[in-house]
Amino acid sequence: MGLIIDTSIIIALERGKVSTKQWSHYGQAYISPIVLTELLIGVDRVNNENKRIKCLAFIEYVKSLFTILPFGIEEVYTYARIINDLYKQRITIGTHDMLIAATAITHGYSLLTLNVKDFKRIQGLEVLTVSSKD
């Protein structure tokens, strides 16, 4: 059994609001390269150099903690299906979320997120969540 970790969980992990222990019972945890992209976009938006260095160090930690799954041709086909399914239902979801979902569906893994509302609308995706310390 495997689990894809969404960006919302990674950000909560960085902020100390969740712990890897909360999902360790699901087995191997992975991230999509899109999650890494979102994290790097966030780093590029940081103006404070010290904070930027901390963010980059955290990204290196994330890369060591999780296997980054590939995004290849199978994921592309799944992504296209997701777009078409949502279009037929007149549902709009962020591009990155659909790409992350495509990675999870293609590999047959559940998705762990704090953004349940959007991901629940994607057919064929098992969505899981954990409680976050606020």
From Swiss-Prot:
PINc domain segment(s): 4-123
Entry keyword annotation includes Membrane: no
Name of one Pfam family that matches: PIN
Keyword Magnesium: yes
EC number annotated for this UniProt entry: 3.1.-.-
Keywords: Hydrolase, Magnesium, Metal-binding, Nuclease, Toxin-antitoxin system
Residues bound to Mg(2+): 6, 97
Enzyme class: hydrolase
UniProt cross-references to InterPro entries, sorted A to Z: PIN-like_dom_sf, PIN_dom, Type_II_TA_system_RNase, VapC_family
Function as written in the Swiss-Prot or TrEMBL entry: Toxic component of a type II toxin-antitoxin (TA) system. Has ssRNase activity. Upon expression in E.coli inhibits growth in liquid culture; this toxic effect is neutralized by coexpression with cognate antitoxin VapB1. Its RNase activity is partially inhibited in vitro by VapB1.
Name listed for the protein in its UniProt record: Ribonuclease VapC1
Species lineage: Bacteria, Pseudomonadati, Pseudomonadota, Alphaproteobacteria, Rickettsiales
